[in-house]
A protein has these predicted regions:
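Transmembrane helix-bundle segments that form internal channels/tunnels in multi-pass membrane proteins
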Residues: 1-79, 83-87
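Extracytosolic and intramembrane catalytic regions of membrane-associated proteins
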Residues: 85-220
Length: 220
């Protein structure tokens, strides 16, 4: 048995080294894989004409998968990283740091690019501050204490993400920092028509006993 297992691993490692052996696909919605599995089981196990529902269900799951949209904007749960979807892929606000989060985002987008490559897609900004316009909102990522301290413009259409806790009121804009994000978790923005919809990790997981979310969600 040991020889057989070693042979399997050897062949797997050899094939995995081929160029193009590893591919990426965008993460499907939670509905897709159950539909695909049930459809396949229905096709295999059912007898008679009703087994045709199996391929129909499988085809429907692939159609849903193809039409799924990834979030236009992703905010890391501690404010350390911001990702904005562009025509060339997701632009990340940092070329290094928060590597685990960056890798998960890119893999779920179906993008094999390195973090340093996707960071080069970012448009405007300066050292310590990255700016991106998404719909009616201007997203500002402040990286480090110096950037947070020097930031002095805050407008109602801005959403500011700080990598460190803010110690002052920026004014008439929405601010997310490690303190507020502890109450919401990571945040994703979707566009439904002209309307922006923000979905938090807390919205998805719910307030369960084991989730350990704070009892209230303070806002700034």
């Amino acid at each position: 048995m040991g020889f057989g297992l070693r042979w399997i691993l050897l062949v797997a490692g050899y094939v995995a080294d081929f160029e193009g052996a590893k591919g990426y696909v965008a993460r499907p919605s939670p509905l897709v894989l159950p539909m695909l599995s049930i459809g396949a089981l229905w096709l295999i196990l059912w007898q008679g004409r009703l087994r045709n529902f199996g391929p129909i269900m499988m085809a429907a799951s692939f159609m849903i998968w193809a039409s799924d949209d990834r979030p236009l904007v992703l905010i890391a749960e501690n404010g350390s990283l911001l990702g904005v979807m562009t025509d060339q892929g997701r632009a990340l606000s940092k070329e290094k740091g928060a590597g685990f989060v960056a890798r998960n985002w890119l893999e779920n987008d179906g993008d094999p690019s390195l973090q340093s490559v996707t960071a080069s897609l970012w448009g405007t900004g300066m050292k310590g501050m990255k700016v991106a316009q998404v719909g009616a909102y201007e997203f500002v990522h402040l990286i480090g204490k110096k950037a947070v301290f020097e930031f002095d413009r805050c407008q109602s259409d801005q959403i500011v993400i700080a990598s460190v806790e803010t110690q002052r009121d920026f004014g008439n804009c929405t601010v997310h920092d490690p303190k507020t994000l502890r109450n919401s978790g990571s945040i994703g923005l979707y566009l439904q028509g002209d309307e922006a919809v923000f979905i938090t990790a807390r919205d998805i997981s719910g307030d369960r006993i084991w989730s350990a979310w704070p009892s209230k969600q303070p806002s700034k």
